Amino acid sequence: MVELVPTLLRQELARLAEDNLRLDGRGQWEGREVTLETDCLYNAEGSAKVVMGDTIVYAGVKFEIRTPWPDRPAQGSLMCGAELRPVAHRKYEPGPPSPQSIELGRVVDRGIRESGCIDMESLCIVPGEKVWGVMIDIHVLSDGGNIFDACGLAAIAALRTATVPAERFDVGEDYTLKVN
Protein backbone atom coordinates (compact mmCIF):
# COMPACT_ATOMS: atom_id res chain seq x y z
CA MET A 1 0.00 0.00 0.00
CA VAL A 2 1.31 3.46 -0.94
CA GLU A 3 1.64 5.92 1.93
CA LEU A 4 -0.44 9.01 1.21
CA VAL A 5 1.67 11.72 2.93
CA PRO A 6 5.04 10.82 1.34
CA THR A 7 3.36 10.55 -2.07
CA LEU A 8 1.69 13.95 -1.72
CA LEU A 9 4.90 15.52 -0.40
CA ARG A 10 6.90 14.06 -3.28
CA GLN A 11 4.34 15.41 -5.77
CA GLU A 12 4.41 18.87 -4.16
CA LEU A 13 8.22 18.95 -4.14
CA ALA A 14 8.29 17.90 -7.81
CA ARG A 15 5.82 20.69 -8.67
CA LEU A 16 7.88 23.29 -6.78
CA ALA A 17 11.10 22.13 -8.45
CA GLU A 18 9.45 22.37 -11.85
CA ASP A 19 8.37 25.94 -11.03
CA ASN A 20 11.84 26.80 -9.61
CA LEU A 21 10.34 27.54 -6.19
CA ARG A 22 11.13 26.58 -2.60
CA LEU A 23 8.65 25.45 0.06
CA ASP A 24 8.49 28.99 1.49
CA GLY A 25 7.70 30.55 -1.90
CA ARG A 26 11.17 31.98 -2.60
CA GLY A 27 12.72 31.44 -5.99
CA GLN A 28 15.25 28.64 -6.40
CA TRP A 29 18.21 31.06 -6.25
CA GLU A 30 16.63 33.67 -3.97
CA GLY A 31 18.18 34.11 -0.53
CA ARG A 32 16.49 35.08 2.68
CA GLU A 33 16.29 38.75 3.65
CA VAL A 34 18.95 39.58 6.25
CA THR A 35 18.96 42.32 8.90
CA LEU A 36 21.75 42.95 11.39
CA GLU A 37 21.63 44.97 14.60
CA THR A 38 24.67 45.45 16.85
CA ASP A 39 25.11 46.49 20.49
CA CYS A 40 21.72 45.04 21.37
CA LEU A 41 22.61 43.22 24.62
CA TYR A 42 23.35 45.58 27.48
CA ASN A 43 25.49 43.24 29.60
CA ALA A 44 27.70 41.93 26.80
CA GLU A 45 30.99 43.52 25.75
CA GLY A 46 29.87 43.08 22.14
CA SER A 47 26.61 41.81 20.70
CA ALA A 48 24.57 41.33 17.56
CA LYS A 49 21.12 40.25 16.46
CA VAL A 50 20.65 38.64 13.05
CA VAL A 51 17.29 38.10 11.42
CA MET A 52 17.55 35.90 8.34
CA GLY A 53 14.08 35.23 7.01
CA ASP A 54 12.25 33.62 9.93
CA THR A 55 15.48 32.81 11.78
CA ILE A 56 16.39 35.03 14.74
CA VAL A 57 19.78 34.73 16.46
CA TYR A 58 21.50 36.74 19.21
CA ALA A 59 25.23 36.56 19.92
CA GLY A 60 27.01 38.10 22.89
CA VAL A 61 30.72 38.38 23.68
CA LYS A 62 32.24 38.37 27.17
CA PHE A 63 35.89 38.45 28.29
CA GLU A 64 37.66 36.96 31.27
CA ILE A 65 41.28 36.74 32.35
CA ARG A 66 42.58 33.17 32.25
CA THR A 67 45.77 31.20 32.55
CA PRO A 68 46.96 30.33 29.02
CA TRP A 69 47.12 26.79 27.74
CA PRO A 70 50.59 25.30 28.38
CA ASP A 71 51.22 24.71 24.68
CA ARG A 72 50.19 28.31 23.80
CA PRO A 73 51.54 30.48 26.62
CA ALA A 74 51.28 33.73 24.65
CA GLN A 75 47.84 33.21 23.09
CA GLY A 76 44.39 34.02 24.34
CA SER A 77 41.54 31.55 24.16
CA LEU A 78 38.21 31.40 22.38
CA MET A 79 35.09 29.48 23.38
CA CYS A 80 31.87 29.49 21.44
CA GLY A 81 28.63 27.96 22.68
CA ALA A 82 25.19 27.78 21.13
CA GLU A 83 21.74 27.26 22.63
CA LEU A 84 18.87 25.66 20.74
CA ARG A 85 15.76 25.84 22.90
CA PRO A 86 12.20 24.62 22.27
CA VAL A 87 11.03 28.19 21.65
CA ALA A 88 13.18 28.20 18.47
CA HIS A 89 11.55 25.14 16.87
CA ARG A 90 9.43 22.20 17.91
CA LYS A 91 12.28 19.78 17.08
CA TYR A 92 14.40 21.12 19.99
CA GLU A 93 13.92 19.80 23.51
CA PRO A 94 14.60 21.29 26.95
CA GLY A 95 17.49 20.00 28.99
CA PRO A 96 21.26 19.82 28.63
CA PRO A 97 22.89 20.94 25.37
CA SER A 98 21.84 18.75 22.47
CA PRO A 99 24.27 17.29 19.94
CA GLN A 100 22.91 19.84 17.42
CA SER A 101 23.69 22.82 19.68
CA ILE A 102 27.16 21.45 20.47
CA GLU A 103 27.87 20.99 16.75
CA LEU A 104 26.57 24.48 15.95
CA GLY A 105 28.89 26.03 18.54
CA ARG A 106 31.83 24.00 17.24
CA VAL A 107 31.23 24.98 13.62
CA VAL A 108 31.08 28.70 14.46
CA ASP A 109 34.12 28.36 16.75
CA ARG A 110 36.14 26.59 14.06
CA GLY A 111 35.13 29.12 11.41
CA ILE A 112 36.39 31.99 13.56
CA ARG A 113 39.62 30.21 14.53
CA GLU A 114 40.48 28.99 11.03
CA SER A 115 39.74 32.35 9.43
CA GLY A 116 42.41 33.99 11.59
CA CYS A 117 40.12 37.00 12.07
CA ILE A 118 41.33 37.30 15.68
CA ASP A 119 45.04 37.50 16.39
CA MET A 120 45.15 35.21 19.41
CA GLU A 121 48.58 36.56 20.42
CA SER A 122 47.07 40.04 20.75
CA LEU A 123 45.00 38.62 23.63
CA CYS A 124 48.11 37.92 25.73
CA ILE A 125 48.47 40.08 28.86
CA VAL A 126 51.48 38.40 30.54
CA PRO A 127 53.00 35.45 28.63
CA GLY A 128 52.55 32.20 30.51
CA GLU A 129 50.43 33.88 33.20
CA LYS A 130 47.46 35.92 31.95
CA VAL A 131 45.55 36.03 28.69
CA TRP A 132 42.10 37.15 27.63
CA GLY A 133 39.51 34.43 27.23
CA VAL A 134 36.89 35.37 24.66
CA MET A 135 33.49 33.73 25.15
CA ILE A 136 30.81 33.90 22.49
CA ASP A 137 27.30 32.88 23.52
CA ILE A 138 24.82 32.28 20.71
CA HIS A 139 21.09 31.95 21.29
CA VAL A 140 18.76 30.83 18.52
CA LEU A 141 15.30 32.25 19.22
CA SER A 142 13.69 31.10 15.99
CA ASP A 143 14.96 28.48 13.54
CA GLY A 144 13.49 29.20 10.13
CA GLY A 145 16.52 27.78 8.30
CA ASN A 146 20.12 28.85 7.67
CA ILE A 147 21.03 28.77 11.38
CA PHE A 148 24.71 28.09 10.69
CA ASP A 149 24.89 31.18 8.46
CA ALA A 150 22.91 33.34 10.88
CA CYS A 151 24.98 32.22 13.89
CA GLY A 152 28.29 32.79 12.10
CA LEU A 153 27.22 36.27 11.03
CA ALA A 154 25.97 37.15 14.52
CA ALA A 155 29.18 35.91 16.16
CA ILE A 156 31.47 37.89 13.83
CA ALA A 157 29.33 41.04 14.15
CA ALA A 158 29.36 40.72 17.96
CA LEU A 159 33.15 40.33 17.94
CA ARG A 160 33.52 43.40 15.71
CA THR A 161 31.65 45.51 18.27
CA ALA A 162 33.37 44.05 21.34
CA THR A 163 35.31 46.21 23.79
CA VAL A 164 37.97 44.45 25.88
CA PRO A 165 37.22 45.53 29.49
CA ALA A 166 40.85 46.00 30.60
CA GLU A 167 39.97 48.77 33.10
CA ARG A 168 37.48 46.56 34.95
CA PHE A 169 40.17 43.90 35.37
CA ASP A 170 42.83 46.49 36.27
CA VAL A 171 45.17 45.59 33.39
CA GLY A 172 45.13 48.82 31.35
CA GLU A 173 42.63 50.82 29.36
CA ASP A 174 39.61 49.44 27.54
CA TYR A 175 40.09 48.92 23.82
CA THR A 176 38.14 47.65 20.85
CA LEU A 177 38.90 44.05 19.92
CA LYS A 178 40.63 43.98 16.55
CA VAL A 179 38.83 41.66 14.13
CA ASN A 180 40.21 41.22 10.61
Predicted features along the sequence, with ranges:
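Polyanion-binding surfaces on beta-sheet-dominated domains and ring/shell assemblies
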Residues: M1-N180
